[in-house]
């Protein structure tokens, strides 16, 4: 794997994948939204090419900026990830159309492998161990849209001779985690020597560090050569209070 393209490049897992790719001397084209406040997250490297865009729907306008053949197309970008938007059907539906556009983008680049970032939310509420072969039963609009986008992009890839791989992301944490997560809340309180308040912490969570998630997606792109689905998780689920 000599070169990759990433949408959602300034997201936590996007940055982690970029760092992993650069460590393996893989050239990276990072698609970044104009005006993003997270540009400083990206590392500096002659192998990293930042390509700015106003909207992913306008991908044709940046084709000329992709100056090398792309071996793997990673689609991490997703709108309306904030908690208040996760059950908004109309908003989440926008992501399905964008995801299909990204397969068209992949095809326009003559790239033969498309990696989609799925989600634990596709399985719906569960208390037992989850396997990638399990039946999906999403409840929130976010999970429904993720599964719809996963299946539809897989179909479109199949129609165009493109390998489709999906990593369904569970609970990832790290230096670029979003504000407001439990871990960020706790760390912030502890650093300021303030009290932090929690529930009894009986819920079970499978936490994975962002670096490991970046490595997982790198390996998916590098090693997978046929249609593929996996869970991106540690495989160990523990009650929150233990963490």
Which residue stretches match the model-derived regions?
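N-terminal Rossmann NAD(P)H-binding glycine-rich loop of SDR-like oxidoreductase domains
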Residues: 4-24
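SDR active-site strand-loop-helix element
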Residues: 7, 31, 73-79, 114-120, ...
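Conserved glycine-rich Rossmann-like NAD(P)H-binding loop of the short-chain dehydrogenase/reductase
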Residues: 26-36
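NAD(P)-dependent short-chain dehydrogenase/reductase
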Residues: 128, 151-205, 210-214, 218-221
């Amino acid at each position: 794997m000599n070169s990759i393209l990433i949408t959602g490049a300034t997201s936590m897992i996007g940055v982690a994948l970029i760092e992993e790719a650069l460590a393996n001397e893989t050239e990276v084209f990072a698609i970044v939204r104009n005006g993003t406040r997270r540009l400083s997250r990206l590392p500096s490297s002659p192998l990293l090419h930042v390509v700015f865009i106003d909207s992913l729907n306008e991908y044709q306008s940046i084709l000329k900026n992709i100056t090398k053949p792309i071996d793997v197309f990673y689609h991490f970008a997703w709108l309306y990830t904030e908690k208040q938007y996760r059950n908004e059907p109309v908003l989440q539906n926008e992501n399905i159309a964008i995801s299909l556009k990204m397969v068209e983008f992949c095809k326009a680049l003559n790239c033969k492998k498309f990696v989609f970032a799925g989600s634990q939310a596709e399985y719906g509420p569960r208390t037992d161990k989850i396997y990638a072969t399990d039946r999906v039963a999403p409840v929130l609009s976010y999970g429904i849209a993720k599964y719809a986008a996963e299946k539809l992009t897989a179909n479109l890839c199949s129609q165009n001779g493109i390998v489709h791989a999906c990593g369904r992301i569970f609970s990832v944490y790290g230096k670029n985690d979003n504000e407001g997560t439990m871990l960020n809340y706790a760390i912030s309180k502890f650093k300021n020597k303030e009290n932090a308040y929690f529930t009894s912490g009986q819920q079970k969570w499978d936490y994975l560090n962002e670096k490991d998630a970046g490595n997982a997606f790198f390996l998916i792109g590098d090693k997978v050569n046929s249609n593929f689905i996996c869970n991106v998780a540690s495989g160990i689920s523990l009650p929150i209070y233990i963490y």
